[in-house]
Structure formats: structure tokens, C-alpha cells
A protein has these predicted regions:
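Extracellular glycan-interaction patches encoded by glycine-rich segments
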Residues: 87, 149-173, 405-409
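Short hydrophobic/aromatic patches on beta-strands that form ligand-binding or substrate-lining surfaces
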Residues: 46-54, 111-113, 160, 173-177, ...
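Extracellular/lumenal carbohydrate-interaction signature centered on repeated Trp-anchored short motifs
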Residues: 34-46, 99-109, 151-154, 165-172, ...
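Low-complexity, glycine/proline/serine-rich flexible segments
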Residues: 1-42, 79-83, 88-93, 154-159, ...
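Extracellular glycan-interaction surfaces
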Residues: 3-25, 47-56, 73-147, 341-344, ...
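Extracellular glycan-recognition modules
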Residues: 28-85, 90, 120-122, 182-187, ...
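Conserved, ordered domain cores of eukaryotic regulatory proteins
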Residues: 52, 254-342
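Extended recognition patches within non-cytosolic domains
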Residues: 2-19, 26-27, 120-122, 127, ...
């Protein structure tokens, strides 16, 4: 069983979502659309599924920005709370800020917001639903006056992934749905699975979207802003490419690196591209920093890749997720009860002991890692060529993919590919279930680390 398993973890969802769109603040990614005419600014709904990556900074999910005194946004604030504010004529006209924080980077949240300023009950004029349940606990709860227009559905530019020219978002969005003129309920966009109780999406294509409504499913890699509602309310794509189309979705959740899984004293690496880009600059001896996967396993056969982005010292492999012995910097992959790794100088590190193993590797090399927890061995591949099997002698524990720099006054950087690559793949290979997009062939019987495979083989 996986150690860390997100809320979207059932094998048979009934309705499958094919794609999400990965936003990265470092690339200034966003979508934009300016409605040609204003419609229902007092009644509308917005639903989407979102998986966060970077935390602790203000990130706008949507923004409608006319000027500094007239704007509207839904965002995660710098305390990771959900924040929805309508600001007009230099005054707050409506605001909800949750007490709850949203720090789970391993799963998708479904967020539904409903604006209905004509509602006779003031507390029902701005409503939030999280995974099918209405949010009722707020640090700030300011109700709009009756009939107060919002900025949404105005002729001001609507952006997804930023507001104005700042506060860019980091994470994945799927099933982005806007309905003009209707107050949706959670059951219009999702349902609780009868066996697991997990909130899951349903087919929304039959909704009445209204004039300015839209449905972005992100399935067309050549037109990522394509509206499939039938309204042709397409969004313009900015700094997003086909590489940012991901199969990491609310019905098949893939592993990423986990910025929360870090002991020690703040010696954190940098994370980008949906927590698939590892970057760490060592500023002295021992200034190394390990990053771990959101998913750990103790049975089955699993495969992932990394792409080296420089020639500096780095190691990759699997680490004890249950009770590792951390050094003063919070690293454990190279400790006696840690795990097994492949060093880019060609050595292997097996439970803290380094010895000769295979070929060295450098910039742009692809390292494949095949984890066999049924037969207790791990095999590393360099550009598709096996470097030999290594025995896993510490059994009965959970292992997690891990990566760590190992240099002195240098920067080590790599892309992780758990089947949802943040870089261009030239060949394209999936596992036996058809999941994942890998540069080299997946060994027979091995699978990508995602929740559908985990439900079947984990």
C-alpha cells in the first residue's frame, strides 16, 4: 500500500478526466479572455479541480482586474488560506477568507464558488464548496449587498493563473467550468463514490453554461484554452505549451516531489514545474538537500525517470519512508538504513556504503529507476541501458523515490518524470496499462506511480 495517497485514489471513477494544465509562476503562465459583452454579474458559478505545488505565497487562481480600485480575485493567500474578494471603488464589497489552510500537495481539491448577490439570505451570496461540502468557517466573511455586481462576466479581461501582472499560480488545474446565470450545487459537478466515500468528478458537458460560460478540459495540446462547452469562449494561452498539458488529474493522481516532506532546519531545495523540477545550490560542505516523492510503496513494481539538467553531483534512488535516520541537513537516502541510490559519478550507494556500479551520467542523460518490491531488487538505467540489478535487503518497509544534490558550492538540477514529464519527450512510452509518458521503454510488468496503478498493483 502507498504511504501517502491523495484523496483522488480510486481505480474506477466512472468518469475519467484525461488532462490537467500545469501552471508555473517562474514561467509567468496564465490564460486570458475578455468577454465581448457583459452578462450576469450578480449570478454565476465557477468549479475546478486543483492540485497545489508551491506553498506559502499569494497565488491567484483567477483575476478580473480593471484597475487598482476595481478588481476581483480568487486566490491562495500567503498563509495558504482560500481567499475570494470583490473590491470596487476602493472598498471591499464582498470577501471570504477561510480558516482552513490548503497545504496538501499530493491530491486535487474540487473548489466550487457561487456568486448570487440577489439571494435573500445575505450569507448565501458568496458560497464556497470544497470536495462537495460547503465551507462555513471563515476568518473574514463580508457579504455583498443585495444586487451587488461582481467583476466576473464583465467586459474586463478575465485571467486564470494570475491577477493583473502578478501573483502567478503554481499547480495543476483540471475540469475548469464557469456557468453564467445559474447557482450550481456540488452535485452538478461531482459525487461521493458509494464504496470509498471519496469525492469524484462527474460529466459536466450537459450543463447549461450560459452566454459567458465555458468548459476547459485541456485535452487539445495545440489549443489549451479551447472551450468545449459549445460557446467557443476560448482563452488565449500565455507562456503555456503542449509540455504543460499533464495526465496528472483528479481521477488519476501522479506522484510529484513533496516540498512538505523535509525535516531539518530549512535546508530546502527549490521546486518548480508542478514539483517536478528539483534545484539546489550547495553553499558549502555538507549543504545537501534531499527531496522525496508524494507516494511511497512497499509492494509491486514501479518505474520513474529523471533528466539531469547539469553535470554537478547528484544522486537518485529510493529511500526508507518509515523511519529513516536523518543527518543534520535532513537527508537520509545515503544513510545506513536509508535506501539505494545511483550517483552521477557511476557509483551506487547501498544503505550508506558507496561502491562502483555503472556508467557516469551528466547533462541531458535520462536515468530510469525500476523498483521491484515483489522480488526485492532495484535496477537503474542510463538512457535505456540497464546498469544491473541491486538487491533490496531491508524489506517490509515503505520506500519512496528520492533525489539529492551532493556537491560543494555548485547547483544540481534535474527533472523528475513519474509519467507526467515537465520536459519534451522524443519517443513516448507508457506502461502496460497505458499510463505515463516516458523517454525510454518501461520494463515489462512495471508501472507508473499513479493512483489507478496503485489501486490495482499497490
Amino acid at each position: 500500500m502507498p504511504l501517502i495517497l491523495g484523496t483522488n485514489s480510486i481505480k474506477d471513477t466512472g468518469y475519467d478526466v484525461a488532462n490537467s494544465l500545469r501552471f508555473n509562476s517562474g514561467s509567468s503562465d496564465y490564460l486570458t479572455r475578455t468577454p465581448s459583452s457583459a452578462t450576469n454579474q450578480d449570478l454565476w458559478s465557477l468549479s475546478f479541480w486543483i492540485k497545489r505545488s508551491n506553498l506559502g505565497s499569494y497565488q491567484s487562481i483567477y483575476g478580473v482586474y480593471a484597475n487598482s480600485t476595481n478588481q476581483e480575485t480568487l486566490a491562495f493567500d500567503d498563509s495558504d488560506r482560500l481567499y475570494w474578494q470583490l473590491y470596487q471603488s476602493s472598498a471591499v464589497k464582498g470577501q471570504l477568507t477561510t480558516n482552513r489552510v490548503f497545504r496538501d500537495v499530493s491530491a486535487f481539491y474540487n473548489i466550487l464558488i457561487v456568486y448570487d448577490s440577489a439571494n435573500g439570505t445575505a450569507g448565501n451570496r458568496m458560497r464556497m464548496y470544497i470536495n462537495g461540502v460547503e465551507e462555513t468557517s471563515f476568518a473574514t466573511d463580508t457579504n455583498p449587498s443585495s444586487g451587488q455586481d461582481s467583476q466576473w462576466n464583465s467586459t474586463t479581461a478575465h485571467t486564470i493563473g494570475r491577477i493583473n501582472t502578478a501573483n502567478y499560480m503554481n499547480g495543476y488545474i483540471s475540469e475548469l467550468v464557469a456557468v453564467d446565470g445559474t447557482a450550481l450545487s456540488p452535485t452538478d459537478v461531482g459525487e461521493f463514490d458509494e464504496d470509498s466515500g471519496i469525492w469524484k468528478p462527474i460529466d459536466v458537458s450537459g450543463l447549461t453554461f450560459g452566454t459567458n460560460g465555458f468548459y476547459l478540459d485541456f485535452e487539445d495540446s495545440s489549443a489549451l484554452g479551447n472551450d468545449v462547452s459549445g460557446n467557443n469562449n476560448d482563452f488565449t494561452v500565455n507562456n503555456l505549451t503542449a509540455i504543460d498539458q499533464s495526465t496528472d488529474t483528479c481521477t488519476n493522481n501522479f506522484a510529484t516531489l513533496n516540498p512538505l516532506d523535509k525535516p531539518g532546519t530549512g535546508n530546502l531545495p527549490g521546486f518548480a514545474e508542478g514539483n517536478l523540477h528539483y534545484n539546489k545550490t550547495a553553499t558549502g560542505s555538507g549543504n545537501n538537500s534531499q527531496a522525496n516523492s508524494t507516494i511511497a510503496v512497499n509492494t509491486g513494481k514501479w518505474f520513474f525517470e529523471i533528466k539531469a539538467l547539469d553535470s554537478n553531483a547528484i544522486i537518485v534512488g529510493i529511500d526508507n519512508a518509515d523511519n529513516p535516520t536523518y543527518d543534520s541537513h535532513g537527508n537520509s537516502i545515503n544513510s545506513s538504513d536509508g535506501g539505494i541510490a545511483y550517483y552521477n559519478n557511476g557509483q551506487k550507494i547501498v544503505y550508506g556504503t558507496a561502491s562502483s556500479y555503472g556508467a557516469s551520467w551528466t547533462t541531458n542523460d535520462i536515468i530510469g529507476i525500476a523498483i521491484n518490491l515483489d522480488d526485492n531488487e532495484i535496477t537503474f538505467y542510463k538512457n535505456g541501458s540497464s546498469q544491473g540489478a541491486i538487491s533490496i535487503t531491508t524489506t517490509g518497509i515503505n520506500y519512496r523515490p528520492a533525489i539529492m544534490n551532493n556537491g560543494y558550492n555548485s547547483t544540481s538540477s534535474a527533472y523528475m518524470n513519474f509519467g507526467n514529464p515537465p520536459f519534451s519527450i522524443s519517443s513516448g512510452n507508457s506502461d502496460g496499462n497505458g499510463y505515463g509518458n516516458f523517454e525510454y521503454s518501461v520494463p515489462s510488468g512495471y508501472y507508473a506511480l499513479n493512483t489507478k496503478n496503485l489501486a490495482e498493483y499497490g
